């Protein structure tokens, strides 16, 4: 697996912006500065991990190197909490549907399903006993 450290991943162009070495990434991590880690398998981008001061975004890429799942975590008291999950559906490389799941630590759950072709939005809310 190849690891690339950079300032940001440019999703539309499928390329890193401002590549740097592991030491710079480590220094950014320790100082709370944003950076991105790109993981490639067989010359294809498989995962993009965006590190921010209190947030981590893990993007799973499909065979076209397009983001199809994102998990968003929030860091609080040295613990990560999954606060959102995004599922993207595509036809060819055109995004046609987005599902968003939002989570709160008190057990509240929010779901939104967006049909990006018709503009229709379906929403649901629930509370889960935690």
Language-model segments: which ranges?
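Buried hydrophobic residues that stabilize the cores of well-folded domains
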Residues: 1-130
């Amino acid at each position: 697996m190849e690891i690339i450290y950079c300032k940001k991943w440019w999703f539309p162009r499928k390329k890193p912006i401002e590549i740097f070495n592991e030491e710079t990434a480590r220094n950014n991590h320790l100082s709370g500065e944003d950076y991105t880690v790109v993981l490639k398998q067989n010359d294809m981008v498989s995962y993009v991990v965006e590190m921010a001061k209190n947030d981590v975004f893990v993007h799973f890429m499909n065979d076209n190197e397009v983001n199809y799942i994102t998990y968003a975590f929030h860091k609080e008291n040295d613990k990560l909490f999954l606060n959102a999950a995004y599922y993207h559906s595509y036809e060819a490389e055109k995004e046609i549907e987005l599902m968003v799941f939002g989570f709160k630590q008190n057990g509240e759950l929010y779901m939104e399903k967006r049909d990006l072709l018709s503009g229709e939005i379906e929403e649901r809310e629930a509370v889960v006993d935690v």
